[in-house]
Regions:
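Conserved substrate/cofactor phosphate-moiety recognition/catalytic segment
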Residues: 27-89
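Conserved phosphate-donor/acceptor-positioning beta-strand/loop module used by diverse small-molecule
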Residues: 113-133
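Conserved lysine of the Walker
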Residues: 22
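Conserved nucleotide-binding/hydrolysis micro-motifs of P-loop NTPases
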Residues: 42-45, 97-98, 123-130, 176-178
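The conserved Walker
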Residues: 17-18
Length: 191
């Protein structure tokens, strides 16, 4: 736990559909703020023993993207985040967090660890998301397996973020420049 001279660590969760810029923006925020970042894309693959760089394009809600395996992935990621918080380390949990129970579980962990909490919801137009996902798929770069079909599936099951007070939740439209989105988040974290 923290003594009076140690600043409270932050637990930040991202949420939003694939292709909205969560990882791109939060990798930069993590670098600027010195926060650790845990990504569901890497953790999911590590749990099945494959390299995060290996792409596993499965249908929405199938294989390592099934409801059961997704639940296991989120629980593991949140537990790993809790370990860092208890060491006084600020951490970003980079994932879609489409379900209220996932977001609420992370919030409870932050409270128990006496950490500050922020849910950052990422949005952009469907056209922009589709463009980004097509570019990502064509380039085969990064660890994400997100594609347009996944975006469409996530959109159908994404539960509105209405469980947090305004001071615990911000929405960032990533249609503007990356720098602008990063600056909005940094400014919010420094309040």
């Amino acid at each position: 736990m923290n003594d009076d001279n140690t600043p409270q660590p932050y637990l930040i969760i991202t949420c939003g559909l694939t292709g909205t810029g969560k990882s791109t923006i939060m990798n930069e925020v993590a670098e600027k703020k010195g926060f650790m970042i845990l990504t569901s894309d890497k953790i999911r693959k590590e749990l099945v023993g494959i390299s995060p760089e290996v792409h596993k394009y499965e249908e929405f809600d199938k294989g390592i993207y099934s409801k059961e395996f997704t639940e296991r992935t989120y629980i593991h990621m949140i537990e790993e985040g809790e370990k860092l918080l208890l060491q006084g380390i600020s951490v970003i949990l980079d994932a879609c967090f489409p379900k209220k129970w996932q977001r609420e579980k992370a919030f409870e962990v932050a409270k128990e660890a006496n950490a500050r909490f922020l849910c950052i919801e990422f949005t952009c137009s469907e056209e922009e998301a589709k463009y980004r996902l097509t570019e990502r798929f064509d380039s085969k770069e990064g660890v994400s397996d997100g594609r347009w079909e996944i975006y469409v599936g996530q959109k159908q099951v994404f539960e509105e973020v209405d469980e947090f007070k305004p001071e615990l939740h911000i929405v960032v439209d990533t249609s503007s420049s990356k720098e602008e989105s990063v600056n909005i988040i940094i400014k919010r974290l420094e309040q």
